[in-house]
Amino acid sequence: MKEMINLDSSSEPSIVTKQFSVEECLSKLKEQHCYVPMRTIGRLRLRKSSDQTEKKCWKEKLMKIRSELEELWEQSMMYEEQKELTQLGEMLDRLWDKHINSEGSKSETISDTAISGNDDTMEKRLEQFSDDTLQDTLETEKNLNSKTSESLKSPTLSYPFDLDSLDKRIFKLESKIGYADEPLSELLNKCMEKLEIVEQDPQFWQSRIESWKQLLAKDFLKHHERNLCSIEKQTTLKNSSLKELCTEEDIVIMLEICSSQLPFVEQYMPILPLLLERLKSLQNMHTDAAEAISSWQGSKDVMMTMQSELNEWKNTVERLDHSKFYTQSVEEMRRLSDTVTQLEKRVLKLQ
């Protein structure tokens, strides 16, 4: 069964007449009466409507304040700050409830005047439906209020809340700890996920932590021993080099001389940079001269070796000149020639 309402206007014939069923009228009224509490809205976007711009601006402001308070409550690490923020949230909830109740009463009066021209059955059904919807919304609101009050339960404070002091404290903490690139809510979520992983098997992670501690202790001991060995080697090398160069008495005498000359150093302060530059240039010159001397010394050594070889050759030649080898060889040649001639004569005689 559908009861139809004919809304035609005889005074304005240009307007198109429409027919609405009872269910459609009830659904429209339900949309007006069944408001959503502010706690359940969170950060959802509001529906756009050109009729209620002022009301929605007011709602949007309250919702922005509420969302900022929720973010601050999530980011705050102090219990006192959370208590103060929950008090502010309760105050905003009261303002929200008052505003919604006033809107509900206005909508009820408007709906009653709009439907007053209809029959009695329509009014009764609308009144029953509005009462039922109001009771349902009140029950849902009470349940949500109880849930939020339990989740954000905190004792009342004896002093008023000041946002400036909270901002100053947050600024001090950030100046001491440092500014994080990520928001605190994401960091807290990551920490919670890690804690959940650890809580799943605490014995396993405890054994791992103990093994890591042992490994770290061993690495620390090895590193410490290496540092000690290197320091001991450096100290021994320094002491040995100093002992080789000079004795302790010489070191004491040099220190006394340096300390006695310290007052005169101030007089030569403007000249010292020029002297240092001159010494650096002289150092380069000395290195070049040392290289030239070393190369000349090498060439001199080569010449000395060549001279010694020439002397040896001269000595051998002189020995050959003064030796009797030449005279002995000439005599032997004569003897050989004589023997050859004698042999030739004998051969001729035989012929």
Swiss-Prot record:
Its main location: cytoplasm. The keyword Cytoplasm applies. Keywords: Chromosome partition, Cytoplasm, Meiosis. InterPro entries: Dynamitin (IPR028133). GO terms for biological process: chromosome segregation; dynein-driven meiotic oscillatory nuclear movement; mitotic spindle organization; nuclear migration by microtubule mediated pushing forces. It holds the Pfam family Dynamitin. Signal peptide: none annotated. Coiled coil: none annotated. GO terms for cellular component: cytoplasm; cytosol; dynactin complex. It is found in: Cytoplasm. Required for correct meiotic chromosome segregation. This is Meiotically up-regulated gene 1 protein. It comes from Schizosaccharomyces pombe (strain 972 / ATCC 24843) (Fission yeast). The gene is mug1.
